[in-house]
UniProtKB/Swiss-Prot annotation:
MF term (GO), any: zinc ion binding
Protein name: Chaperone protein DnaJ
Subunit structure: Homodimer.
Keyword Mitochondrion: no
Residues bound to Zn(2+) 2: 166, 169, 188, 191
Zinc finger (CR-type) in chain: 136-214
Cellular location(s): Cytoplasm
């Protein structure tokens, strides 16, 4: 089945800002997260689709490629033939611009020397809890990656042999072709721009110079990190080609939905049910925070939906000593399954309210006044 447009998946316009894209993704992630829909395959597919769309559109380079070329622009299988399977889509641009400016987008070459490529960046998606995001912690991750072959030491050639100068391009990495009145320089089809070829490939890595491995890396999650942020681990991407530098690893953070709190920047929000007696008479209530319990006083006559602000009970911002606030939205709870005695007491209470006039129900009086003026 054909993939849907990434902008359509997130429900944003093609000129949407990074913040709009992030907010749209967070909304969908909260709605379709597997933790909230444990038995829904449909929700799982929606979550994966939204996650893929966000990963592409939140990366400026990938978004630009997608905007110009669609799904083909970000498909890792497109353009993979260049540079013996390394570099992918970026190498296609490298061949074009490298011929014009003397170096490739993915690397460069000294004149007469083999093409040098920087290793591809890797991305690792990591889910953490809200508590871990708030307090920070150190952890280990296992990342599937590529490493230089230990048998041929990354050369791709059988031990005892070495790569030879490409006979087609004579080590230049490019060949010139004439088409009518034009002379076009393009990547050598035999060596794929490396300037060398391998007559006897290494049996262990089949001439690629790299082997699959799983790296165990230490990752420090800083306190205050937010959903969608990335942590860069320099040099832990794929190895370079022909002496090129290794790429980087980007650990992208996704925060799981919390059972109690919703995060908005450095602020937290929670819904707090309170008995109708506490709402009417006032009193002290306890609320959970990420640092333990806190208490505050509910004034007499509190209405359902009233919001209370607890300063400094939110999350400390990234690299900041100042914490956000906790917003408690109280919901007045109506009692159910009353006994006969409780029902009689409430009827007496209701009668006493009626005798006292509208002063006991200011919201009802205001509402009825508005309705009355509407029909006049």
């Amino acid at each position: 089945m054909a993939k849907r447009d990434y902008y359509e998946v997130l429900g944003v316009a093609k000129n949407a800002s990074d913040d709009e894209i992030k907010k749209a993704y967070r909304k969908l992630a909260m709605k379709y997260h597997p933790d909230r829909n444990p038995d829904s395959k449909d929700a799982e597919e929606h979550f994966k689709e939204a996650k893929e769309a966000y990963e592409m559109l939140s990366d400026g380079q990938k978004r630009a490629a997608y905007d110009q070329y669609g799904h083909a622009g970000v498909d890792p299988n497109v353009g993979a033939a260049g540079a013996q399977g390394f570099g992918g889509f970026a190498d296609a641009f490298g061949d074009i611009f490298g011929d014009i400016f003397g170096q490739a987008a993915g690397g460069g070459r000294a004149r007469g020397g083999p093409q040098v490529y920087r290793g591809a960046d890797l991305r690792y998606s990591m889910e953490i809890t809200l508590e871990q995001a708030a307090h920070g912690y150190d952890t280990q991750i296992r990342v599937p990656s590529w490493a230089a072959c230990g048998v041929c030491h990354g050369s791709g050639a059988k031990p005892g042999t070495k790569p030879e100068t490409c006979p087609t391009c004579h080590g230049q990495g490019t060949v010139r072709m004439s088409q009518g009145f034009f002379s076009i320089q393009q990547t050598c089809p035999k060596c794929h721009g490396t300037g060398t070829y391998i007559p006897e490939p290494c049996a262990h890595c089949h001439g690629s110079g790299k082997v699959k491995e799983t790296k165990t890396l230490e990752v420090k999650i800083p306190a205050g990190i937010d959903d969608g942020m990335r942590i860069r681990s320099a040099g832990n991407g794929e190895p370079g080609i022909n002496g090129g530098p290794s790429g980087d690893l980007y650990v992208e953070i996704h925060i799981k939905p919390h059972a109690v709190f919703e995060r908005d920047g450095d602020d937290l929000h929670c819904q707090m049910p309170i008995p109708f007696t506490t709402a009417a008479l006032g009193g002290e209530i306890e609320v959970p925070t990420l640092a333990g319990r806190a208490s505050f006083t509910v004034p007499e006559g509190t209405q359902s939906g009233k919001t209370f602000r607890l300063r400094g009970k939110g999350i400390k911002g990234l690299h900041s000593s100042i914490a956000g606030d906790l917003y408690v939205h109280v919901q007045v709870e109506t009692p159910v399954k009353l006994t006969d005695q409780q029902r009689d007491l409430l009827k007496q209470f209701e009668k006493s309210l009626a005798e006292g006039g509208p002063r006991h129900s200011p919201q009802s009086k205001s509402w009825f006044d508005r309705v009355k003026s509407f029909f006049e």
